[in-house]
Amino acid sequence: MDKLKKVLSGQDTEDRSGLSEVVEASSLSWSTRIKGFIACFAIGILCSLLGTVLLWVPRKGLHLFAVFYTFGNIASIGSTIFLMGPVKQLKRMFEPTRLIATIMVLLCFALTLCSAFWWHNKGLALIFCILQSLALTWYSLSFIPFARDAVKKCFAVCLA
């Protein structure tokens, strides 16, 4: 069906390079992409929840929490690669409108792990996990048109 759409829209050319044939042959079907997205997102949610439960394990709880919670959030973001593809996802992550949000998310990932493994500070790890969640929310809102503007206005009204 996609090939028919390309031919009808004039996008299909007869001179196809070997690379374009490899890319087309290795691309996933839409149903496989949806299944991959759901599986990766579910793994991310489960890891985050497991990390929250493991926080209360004596001695190693903080390390387990930081690893599972951060890995869960990375898996949740990574799940969208199935929908968009890796190159398009990376391009969209670093667009000017969401560059700061992307940097904050990546920084919070790193700081959460640093506070657990190098600094051994539970309070700081929890703060960075909260910031991680807020940064991910802000990053996610950047994909919904005018959502961040609406959130800003709501907070401005609430604080005024």
UniProtKB/Swiss-Prot annotation:
Residues recorded as bearing N-acetylmethionine in the entry: 1
Stretches in topological domain Lumenal: 58-63, 120-123
GO cellular component: cytoplasm; endomembrane system; extracellular exosome; intracellular membrane-bounded organelle; membrane
Record InterPro entries: Vesicle_transpt_Got1/SFT2, Vesicle_transpt_SFT2
Cellular localization per UniProt: Membrane
Superkingdom of origin: Eukaryota
Transmembrane segments: 37-57, 64-84, 99-119, 124-144
List of residues that carry Phosphoserine: 9
Record keywords, A-Z: Acetylation, Membrane, Phosphoprotein, Protein transport, Transmembrane, Transmembrane helix, Transport
Disulfide bonds: none
Ranges facing Cytoplasmic side: 1-36, 85-98, 145-160
One of the GO BP terms on file: vesicle-mediated transport
Topology of this chain in the membrane: Multi-pass membrane protein
Keyword Lipid metabolism tagged: no
Transport in keyword set: yes
Family, per entry: Belongs to the SFT2 family.
Function: May be involved in fusion of retrograde transport vesicles derived from an endocytic compartment with the Golgi complex.
Name of the molecule in the record: Vesicle transport protein SFT2B
Native organism: Homo sapiens
